[in-house]
């Protein structure tokens, strides 16, 4: 089964073709990071306009390598995300499905990120615990043996990625905050400053990062003699401590020995290092997608579309974009 995947939920325009849920035929992504850097974050209207510009170009490139008539299923993200951005990819996918007379599958963006880890690890079988951590989401999930997903914890305010972006802005480091803090923190001392770990001792599996961000703000207003590298490292350490502790606690309480980390923040080097240390110490199996599958991409959409199509779970052509779609 050949699936064409389209991703336009935020600021990456992506098109991919995947055969039988595992063989990559085409994979194109155009990032808008440089465009949004001057604004300090993603501007929804600007993102949508660039999707309109970039998507036809990527589809043309894809169909130069893959004859359109060989596509069996068309899949696209329909939520969650930015409504204008979502509509670009969703509308294109429906139009292609109609013109090619092929079935259409709407894909949940969060579920697609989870599928990225199965794409990268074909022999991986559930059940497993998954931490989805990105600029828009911080969720702890259980993937059941039938591949259904349950959200067991989530952020009550800012996502971890959003906290990275806001603290990077406070430190004058620019956008996007995750990669730049990761890079700058390598030169700093993560034990230099003690920032709070909100909800770390809470019995739930929920998160809160707004207070941590505010603590950094008050620190910067109060202190005059500090190194940006030390603040970045200490902030990053606080975030990583929260994410790692909550994730392993859930796995331990569920009796599950396999844990996956997906989403843009899963590319963070300190997170990966701390996770691997703890997994080795406590004998857990941990899985990360390769870096190129952590950020938004169309391969994960094609994979999710394949899994749904395999089960006959096609979508109606009147499916609408849902910016607040839940798992």
Swiss-Prot record:
HAMAP family found in the cross-reference section: TsaD (MF_01445)
Family: Belongs to the KAE1 / TsaD family.
Binding-site residues for Fe cation, renumbered to this chain: 109, 113, 296
Role this protein plays: Required for the formation of a threonylcarbamoyl group on adenosine at position 37 (t(6)A37) in tRNAs that read codons beginning with adenine. Is involved in the transfer of the threonylcarbamoyl moiety of threonylcarbamoyl-AMP (TC-AMP) to the N6 group of A37, together with TsaE and TsaB. TsaD likely plays a direct catalytic role in this reaction.
Any coiled-coil regions, as ranges: none
Protein name: tRNA N6-adenosine threonylcarbamoyltransferase
Top class in the EC scheme: transferase
Organism: Thermotoga petrophila (strain ATCC BAA-488 / DSM 13995 / JCM 10881 / RKU-1)
One CC-aspect GO term: cytoplasm
GO molecular function, one term: N(6)-L-threonylcarbamoyladenine synthase activity
EC number: 2.3.1.234
